[in-house]
Amino acid sequence: MSLKFTNTLSKKKEDFISINPNQVKIYCCGVTVYDLCHLGHARSYLNWDVLRRFLIWKGFEVKFVQNFTDIDDKIINRANKEGCSTDELSERNIDEFHKDMDTLSILRPTSMPRATKCLHQIINFIEELEQKKVAYSSNGDVYFSVDKHKNYGKLSGREIEDQIDNAAGRLKTNQKESKKNSLDFALWKKSNSGEVSYSSPWGNGRPGWHIECSAMVKQELGESIDIHLGGSDLIFPHHENEIAQSEACNGKELAKYWLHNGMVNVGGEKMSKSLGNFTTIRSLLEEDISPMTLRFFVLQTNYRKPLDFTEEALKAASKGWERLNNCLSFGYIYKIKDQSKNEIFLDKPIKKSANTKLDKNSFKLLSDFEKYMDDDLNTSGALSILFELSQPIRKIINFLKEKDINEVDQDELNQVFNKWELLSELAGVLGLKVNLNQEKPKNNPELDTNKIEELIKNRSLAKANKDFLLADKIRADLKNIGIDLIDKPKGVTEWKQLSD
């Protein structure tokens, strides 16, 4: 089966064929950095992280670009409210964004351009649109002429005529005077007195939201890309407007494939900051929800479908991840001596291995996993394969609760280790990173205080190097396996096992 995606542009599931063989260029719309990220952001970026990991596993070279909108009305309003500059607010929230994404083991993009760092490219892009007579300036603003783009509405399926009256009713008085058409959208906005602004041929102002992405795509990836990503709430107007301005400027198709993730719902409504029904990633993790539980929860639902967020669903995901993690931990306990040298413990993509030692059943499961993922990233189906691979490992784990590993038939044990290696590889494709298991077999000689002491030493070094993110992560990892740390004077750290 070939790799297929549901393309919002064609409204069909299509075979994926990259523009250049073995190379994929991807652009993902990033966050507006005025606040902490919520679960809706986590859902989106976890899904696209898995897409990227899967493409790399299949042998593609992936260039993945994701932007930051660091100047916007929301940022200006929040900065005024907090009494800080827009730069200070943006910088702080960009740092917090990285902390959240790193904690969730989301691979950092190849490039993360910021709107304020791309002003030259944005202004040049707008000037090109003016030269092509598809943009016009008015009272310090610059607008895109929607009626000059014949295919406007091709992504969202909206007809221009159906939108004109609705748009006209939403216009402010000054916009009615400036716009030629109620659907025309801003490429450059004149700044109000006292607002942050940047110089331009049209006077002081700031870029419109849509033009940022078009300029950054062109700067980072060229005029045409393979895949454009975002939430379904961005289809109109943001992505529709991106297509219009990019294709009018470049005369080429902006993206072959448009993939959109569904929304996270709470009580039947979309989770959003405007509705006040959002849960931040930070607050979830502070409630002892592990990063891998959150990833597992998200991957149980296809990326295109709505994801219902309930406490019950999160608890079920926690139990499911615990079962899978117990099996992933098995190889570390009995085979892998150095965690730092094994790919399954690291936040990096995994490439497909030769898998020469697999039995017939394991080859079939490997094939089924790839078929599920090839079918529009069917992550729930892929997870079912991981649990099927886990069954013989679980059997051995249960045996070892009462017996010694030397009592297991060596051929059988070798086959189980082979299955574990495949399980670890496929879990890595989904970005599921093993946590050392709380549920150790009773006779396991490597429930090993040496490993705990080594992690504590690594944490102390991280603190000495002021790498507090790593130090906090080591503490969290130890807590996940039932170990609590107590920091004492003079840099001494003691530990104790948490009671059930």
Swiss-Prot record:
Localization annotation: Cytoplasm
Cofactor binding comment, as recorded: Binds 1 zinc ion per subunit.
Any one GO molecular function term: zinc ion binding
Example GO biological process: cysteinyl-tRNA aminoacylation
CDD domains (UniProt xref): CysRS_core
Residues that coordinate or bind Zn(2+): C29, C213, H238, E242
InterPro entries, per database record: Cys-tRNA-ligase, Cys-tRNA-synt_Ia_DALR, Cys-tRNA/MSH_ligase, Rossmann-like_a/b/a_fold, tRNA-synt_1_cat_dom, tRNAsynth_Ia_anticodon-bd
Binding site for ATP: K273
Motif ('KMSKS' region): 270-274
Signal peptide: none
Co-factor(s): Zn(2+)
Superkingdom per UniProt: Bacteria
Family: Belongs to the class-I aminoacyl-tRNA synthetase family.
Quaternary structure annotation from Swiss-Prot or TrEMBL: Monomer.
Protein name, as recorded: Cysteine--tRNA ligase
